[in-house]
Amino acid sequence: RFESRGLGDVYKRQLLQTSDRLLMTYQVLARKWRPNTFDEVVGQDYVVKALKGALDLEKLPHAFIFSGTRGTGKTTLARILAKAINCSNSKKKSQPCRKCDSCLSIENGSAIDFQEVDAASRRGVEETKELLDSVPYLPTSSPFKIYLLDEIHMLSKESFNSLLKTLEEPPEHVVFLFATTEIDKVPPTVLSRCVQFNLSAMKVDNIKNQLQLIFDEEKIKYDENSLIKLSSLARGSMRDALTLSEKVISFSEGKITEKKVEELMGLPSSELIQSILKSIIGRDSKKLIELSLIHI
C-alpha cells in the first residue's frame, strides 16, 4: 500500500508539472498572431504605407499618435515602428529584421532604449516628470530612445502640460509614440506637435480572411458561416475576433460552427431569423407570435 501511494504521488506530481508546462507554453491566439512586421498588419494599408515611406526616406518626426477603436492595431503598429527605427541589420529601414539585439529586446520586453508606459495606471504628473527626466540622456545602444505611451488620453492635465514642454523642443535622439482610443481627450496643443494616424475599424472581410488563415495554421476545424458570424461580432476589432474565437473553440467539440457561435453568444439562430422574416413578409401574425414565444 505504501508503495502504491508513493507511485500515485509521483504520478500526480508529474501530471501537475506537465499541466504547468502546458500553461506556461500556451499563448492566446491574439498574442500569438500579433503582427511583428508591417507586412503582417491587416486592414490598415494607408497607415502602413505612410509609415514605411517615412522610414525609407529617413524623414521621421519626433512624435506620432495612433488613434482608433480597440483592437485595431495601435500599440502593435507603434511597436513595429519602434523596431524599424532602431533596427541595426535591416537593409531597408521599413523592414525590421527581428534578429538584431534591438529588435529582439523590444519583442521580449527587455529593451533599454525603448520604454512602454501604460498612461492609464501612470497618469500623475510626478510619474510623467520621472519619465521625462530620462529624456535628455543619450540612448545606450540604439540610434534613438523611444517612448511609447499607451492610452495617453488618461494623463492628467498637469501631466500633459509637463509633456508639452518636451514635445515643443524634443532632443534629436528621442521619438515619442502615443496610442489612444479617445483622441478627443488629448489636448490640441499636444496633437498639433504629433503626426496623427487614425486607424479605421477593420472590415468584416479582412477579419474573416485573417481568421481563416489562423484557423488553418492552427489546424482548427470550422465552417464558412462561423467565420462570417465571428467576424461580424468582432465589430472591427481583430483582437476581439480572436478572443471570441478562443471562447468558441473551448465550447465547441472538434469543430467551430455557426450554431455553436450563436449558442455561446445567446443569439437567435439563423433559421429563426429567416422564419421571422418570412412571417413578416407573408403577414403571418400567428406564426410570428409562435416564433417569438419559442425564442423567449
Question: How does the language model describe each region?
Answer:
Residues N108-I112, E127-E130, P143, A179, ...:
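Extended, largely alpha-helical regulatory/partner-binding modules appended to the mid-to-C-terminal parts
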Residues L15-Q196, N206:
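P-loop/Walker A NTP-binding region and its immediately flanking N-terminal helices
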Residues R1, V41, A54, S279-G282:
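Hydrophobic side-chain positions on well-ordered alpha-helices
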Residues R1-Q14, I294-H295:
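Single conserved hydrophobic/aromatic residue that forms the stacking wall/gate
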Residues Y11, D20-L22, K286:
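Intrinsic disorder/low-complexity detector
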Residues S4, A120-S121, S237:
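Short linear Ser/Thr-Pro motifs
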Residues S4-G8, P187, G266:
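A short glycine-leucine-enriched loop at secondary-structure breakpoints
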